[in-house]
Amino acid sequence: MSYTDIPAGNAIPDDFFTVIEIPANHSPIKYEVDKPSGQIFVDRFLSTPMFYPANYGFIPNTLSDDGDPLDVLVICPYPVSPGVVIRSRPVGVMYMTDEAGADAKVIAVPHEKLSSMYSNVKECSDLPALLLAQIQHFFENYKALEPGKWVKMGRWGSADEAREDIRKSVAAYNLKKEASK
């Protein structure tokens, strides 16, 4: 099955699906889903001995500014296995730039239907400051030992900005899909 068979969500932008590629607190291995086949490949072994501080994946059937599906970090109490789809809701967005250009990461929590643990979290600022610092530190440093690769942190955006980024990425995907017919 291809991940293009999975819709972006139930009620975009507040209830979306995230395909997990890398579990939280996992070994320093960067996995990527091959979108057409649905297979999970090892993209590379991170040169820095660091692990992703949250479950990392993407929203299917989206297209972000970097030409890939929109990236998501899902904050939850457990690592989620690669290839699993989790219902998510946005609480913010992290704007950054890397060697390939602009690269936004939606910050999300599990949808209320999955867990009430995060029902009080409406914005990134409702998350622990240490967790946000860990996320920022990870992305600012995880490419540091890879020649030609770099990341520059921009700013944290609101849940409303994340929702707008999700809407835009769904629209961009649909536009590209229509143009290819």
From Swiss-Prot:
Its EC number is 3.6.1.1. Mg(2+) 1 binds at residues 66, 71, 103. One of its GO terms (biological process) is phosphate-containing compound metabolic process. Its cofactor is Mg(2+). One of its GO terms (molecular function) is inorganic diphosphate phosphatase activity. GO terms for cellular component: cytoplasm. The keyword Magnesium applies. It catalyses: diphosphate + H2O = 2 phosphate + H(+). Mg(2+) 2 binds at residue 71. It comes from the Bacteria. The keyword Glycoprotein does not apply. Signal peptide: none annotated. Gene3D superfamilies: Inorganic pyrophosphatase (3.90.80.10). Keywords: Cytoplasm, Hydrolase, Magnesium, Metal-binding. It is an enzyme of class 3 (hydrolase). Substrate binds at residues 30, 44, 56, 142. It is found in: Cytoplasm. Catalyzes the hydrolysis of inorganic pyrophosphate (PPi) forming two phosphate ions. Belongs to the PPase family. Homohexamer. This is Inorganic pyrophosphatase 2. It comes from Pseudomonas syringae pv. tomato (strain ATCC BAA-871 / DC3000). The gene is ppa2.
